[in-house]
Regions:
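Conserved short beta-strand edge segments in small beta-sheet-based binding/regulatory domains
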Residues: 239-251
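An accessory alpha-helical subdomain
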Residues: 146-239
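N-terminal small/polar loop signature for handling phosphorylated ligands or for N-terminal nucleophile
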Residues: 30-83, 89-90
Length: 251
């Protein structure tokens, strides 16, 4: 894994047949990515996999060696197909069972009378895992080494990220600027490539769009060096003016 301050990276593993089938649209990647960006962690890979134990184990074992942080979403609920916790235990060769602290949290949250088998299942995880507290619905996520296991429900996941801020050691904050223009990609491809060659430590992406009846392209400029972003944007604006391409917005 890359441990330098200059670059800290992460991957997300989305676990769930409902995502792969198209029944549910994932929004957690956007939430986690924006949060990581603020912490100076670059999201470099996202995988969507099914609720199959071997697939989870294989994917996590591969990514935990490759990235500083791995975030999993989904599969830690009360039903039979929620198998992420058990799979993570096997990936790390750890004992799986009732986590004492998680059990106590859930028993208190639901009350003994309503603390049924399904709810107790949410306390089952690697027994030596660190917990990620859940201010929304009680059931905690957990951490093993550099793997962070979160629920798939977007609102709950988002509420849990705040408690992780001090656990994530990021690199330099990543700054972003966007320039939108009214043109087609082919008109700016060559000069944009020349700018990218000049600013090798800046990531430049171009994304075509169609809105309000107009065709356009958004250029997203990203770097941990704010001055380089500003200089890069000046170069882009300069060639846009030379080519008389209308800017639709800059932020």
């Amino acid at each position: 894994m890359n441990k330098t301050k200059e670059k800290v990276n992460a991957a997300i593993v989305i676990i769930g047949n409902e995502i792969l089938s198209g029944r549910t649209q994932d929004v957690n990647v956007v939430t986690i990515s924006k949060w990581l960006n603020e912490l100076g962690v670059k999201l470099e890979e996202v995988r969507v996999i099914s609720d199959i134990e071997n697939s989870i184990i294989k994917t996590v074992n591969e990514l935990k060696k490759k990235f500083n942080y791995v975030f999993t979403t989904g599969g830690i609920g009360p039903t039979h197909d929620d198998i992420t916790s058990k799979s993570i235990s096997k990936a790390f060769n750890l004992s799986y069972g009732y986590h004492k602290e998680a059990y106590a949290i859930l028993e208190k949250y639901y009350g003994k009378a309503k603390f049924n088998v399904g709810r107790k299942k949410m306390a089952m995880m690697p027994i030596k895992a660190s917990l990620i507290l859940n201010p929304s619905s009680g059931a905690p996520g957990f951490i093993v080494d550099n793997v962070y296991c979160l629920p798939g429900v977007p609102a709950i996941l988002k509420s849990m990220l705040g408690g992780l801020k001090n656990k994530i050691k990021g690199g330099k904050k990543i700054f972003t600027k966007t320039i939108s223009v009214q043109t087609v990609e082919s008109e700016i491809a060559k000069p944009l490539e020349e700018v990218q060659q000049k600013f090798k430590r800046v990531d430049i992406g171009s994304y075509p769009f169609f809105r309000l009846g107009k065709i356009g392209v958004s250029m997203v400029i990203r770097s941990s060096d704010k001055k380089k972003i500003d200089d890069c944007c000046k170069e882009i604006v300069s060639f846009l003016k030379k080519k008389r391409i209308n800017m639709m917005g800059k932020k």
